[in-house]
Amino acid sequence: MTALPGETPGTDDVAAEDVTGGAAADPAPAEAPGAAEDGEAQVQEAGAAAEDPAADATASDATASDGTADATASGGTVDGTTADGTGDASPAPELSEAQAELAAQRELRERIEKRKAEKAAPIAAGTGLSGTAADLLAAVRAVESGEKAGSAFFASPAPAQAPRRPAPAAAQPPRTPAPETTAPAPQAASPEAVAAVRAVLVEGGAPEALARPAVGALGEQAAELLRTDPWQLLAVPGVRPEQADGFARALLGDGCGPDDGRRTAALVGWVLERAALQGHTALDADTVRTALAERAVSDPDAAVREAVEEGVALLFGENEEQEPDDTGAEDGEADGAVSEEDAEAEREPVQLLLGLDRYALAEESLAEGLARLVNACEKAADWAEAAAAAPSPSAAELIRTSAAAGLVVHSGGEAARAEPAALIAAARGLGLRAFGATHSEDGRRRLADAIGDPDTAVTLAGLLSGAQGPGRDEDGALALDLLVVLDAPQLDVESAAVLVEALADGVRLVLSGDPGVLGSAGAGRVFADVLAARACPQVVSRTPDPGPIGELVSGIGIGELNQVDAPGKEVVIVPVRDAGEAVHRTVQLVADSVPRAFSIPAEETQVITVGHGGAAGTRALNEALKQRLNPGPGRFGGFDPGDRVVHVPAPGRAVPGVVRSADAEGLRLDCGGVPVVVPQERVESSVRHGWALSAHQAAGMRWPAAVVVLPGDAAQGLSRPWVYTAFGRGERHLSVVHGVDQALPHAVAQVPAQERTTRLRPLLEALPTPDAAP
């Protein structure tokens, strides 16, 4: 594998430990999806995957193992019959231990559901969602039922909802500047509840600072819950099992032990929550059992069963969604005999998965919603004339495909974003209400420029909240006919479920993105699962990314770190020996070299590094860059006017901005032209300096110049998707501060994307979707 042009081998003295603490045998990105510095005040940084999948699920800085494997028993069903349904013609083979356990767990789940139904009214779909997704779903249903107007969910007066009508062909007048918005804050905890929890924490020897987060996680009854079940403290972000054990011993004395049912149930939930931070929506049951055993649980099998019975987790069989195949009798098995191959297949173990109900409900709701869009769309639309006028063959193919399908997947690099823009413009020319939703404000701006109409581009968060876009129709659904979601790999399963539920029958949905970039910060892999399930037509762009940076990134996408010709110094390699030199050279590049050579000011250059910690992580780099570019005392909670920051209004959303001022209401930011006020109590937890970002934070955005910092101690945190994402953030110039020697080509060639365990793909494959890709 050839090195980058100008690359100089680094020193052999690579640090023994990288910033992630990952094992060399199984390197993974140092930054955990969903734990990107926005939760640093509460959550420890997650690191690379551990070599042992079980240890993976329990270590605070380890990536939970997905345990994914296609263990579906071909031709067999859980109840022991053959796939053709003829199992009654001969003695059925004995159930395997896993199959018997699955059947028993199914019966148990039925009893649990029956008991729940007797105690309370039926639970509406979506109640398993939480956080931003739950808030958005509640807002959608309140509007649908007429209980509240859409404007009730705006922090400031919102524009009146547009009636359902075809979009005018002529360009509309530009919108007035967006009103100042206040960053959403969690529901305030009552002083009484916080005081009660604080008293319990003090009694148990836990830090008083956990009082407010505990009320946020457990609700107003947190004090009572913690007193009766101290291990509920594990629901508070950042709390470790050993800390919860000490808290429980202080409160319960000798009345608790490692096999206490309250403890084991809380541990199961904790393991699954940790896995969700790494993107998994479920875990192999064996992985969970191993994690429990490492936490001194003597009978992990019983602990898992009890957790399922109590509703802490749900149990799934990998092949339980598959329908029996009744073709066997027609193929020579009319006598109903079970073939030896089928009998052997039925004896194969069934992979059992454990998952939290919020992600299970989200994946099931999303799968059903996508199938609804596929089957409800009018497929006889004639967009041939619009396709003929498309600016490229790939754009024409996308237009033709979208005309005949309710769900389409479009994949391509940065230059391929012109194709969804052409589709939106063509659809609006046909009188349809077509919009494009992006992951970031920067992506929204670039899409609006490509379409030529700023009103057609929104951020996904703005669309779902109602702050941007067409508003809702009289039925409470989004008032549109075609929606293109760009940056689709950044779409987590809960947000995707809320989005699809807000789309009416007949709406066309296009998921567009680059499969090579890092996945979503939240749990799930929606874009990859829809691609893998082949449940709808797929359009692969043939438009290459231009220039030396585009050529370099395209090679990385296929595992090759090629030499590229860069006559204009579009790609520059800066070798360094250690982290201290990496920080020094980075500051020099941003403040002097790049502005002088390319006339790109420092505020338009973005630094990207592997993780937040370490001698050359985002914190160290931001401190050095602030001292050089905007020194000051940090009189506004550590910030000064002119500081570049990143605002994290919700986990997984990083919004770059600049500090303008501060007053009694909070810290005032300018986030891509949108004024934002962050309340004082939220500044510490949701605002960080932003001259340097992690690659996850930078996903979905681009800058005129990017400086990627690769210190030697970050070598094991590199992967192909990480390098692909980081190197692709610069539009005109890319500098690589290179101190990882041969770890860079190794990562590109041999460290693919970290797998995530999800259920969306088999759910989609089991649903009837006539438009499935061949």
Language model segments and positions:
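Accessory, non-ATPase domains that flank or precede helicase/AAA+ motor cores in DNA-metabolism machines
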Residues: 2-70, 74-385, 389-392, 773-774
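Residue-level signature of catalytic and energy-coupling elements of molecular machines
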Residues: 240, 288, 366, 514, ...
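ASCE P-loop NTPase motor cores of helicases and related translocases
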Residues: 342, 346-482, 535, 554, ...
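Conserved helicase motor core of P-loop NTPases
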Residues: 394-406, 419-428, 516-652, 660-662, ...
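Structural motif
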Residues: 409-411, 435-437, 482-486, 510, ...
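Conserved helicase motor core of SF1/SF2 NTP-dependent helicases
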Residues: 431, 441-446, 461-466, 477, ...
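Short, charged beta-turn/beta-strand-edge "cap" motif at the junction between a beta-strand
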Residues: 648-655, 712-714
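C-terminal accessory regions
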Residues: 671-774
